[in-house]
A protein has these predicted regions:
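Alpha-helical transmembrane segments of multi-pass membrane proteins
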Residues: 1-156
């Protein structure tokens, strides 16, 4: 691809993704028990891993449609950040009942699937950008790291 990579939007996306992760950790520490807050990190990693798996399978068709897929992932990220958190609040999960109520594990899995969606969309946009612009990987990765650092610092 001869055009330039979308470095500014990629930086903002990375900042928002890591900021959202930190926000979820704080919210889970308040709303749920503190040990559920540490599970947010694994949620983000699962979302990124799932994205990498999908990109390894469908990278060629997705790279041909890069601008549309990139913009769609950013839009879906924004919608899923708010939507997934609101939907998770409707799931009747109670961590105290996990031991004797088998449905609580189903509710927990449902919450996990909903909450990993924003991380999946962010990682898909970032990963596809890295694939489409192979000669600019160091620059793209640098802007991604700057965005992640900025997103962390702004929330702390």
């Amino acid at each position: 691809m001869t055009s330039r990579p979308p470095l500014f939007s990629l930086t903002l996306l990375s900042a928002c993704a890591l900021g959202y992760e930190i926000l979820l950790i704080h919210l889970f520490a308040i709303i749920r028990h503190h040990h559920f807050a540490s599970m947010v990190i694994s949620l983000a990693l699962i979302g990124y891993g799932l994205s990498g798996t999908c990109l390894s399978i469908w990278r060629l068709p997705l790279s041909r449609l890069y601008p549309a897929v990139y913009i769609s992932c950013i839009i879906f990220f924004g919608c899923s950040v708010l939507g997934s958190f609101l939907l998770v609040q409707q799931i009747p999960f109670n961590g105290d009942e996990v031991i004797w109520d088998k449905y609580q594990l189903v509710y927990l899995c449902g919450q996990f699937l909903l909450l990993l969606l924003p991380f999946f969309f962010a990682a898909t946009a970032i990963g596809l950008t890295l694939y489409v612009y192979p000669l600019r990987i160091t620059t793209i990765y640098g802007f991604d790291l700057v965005g992640a650092g900025a997103g962390s610092l702004l929330l702390i």
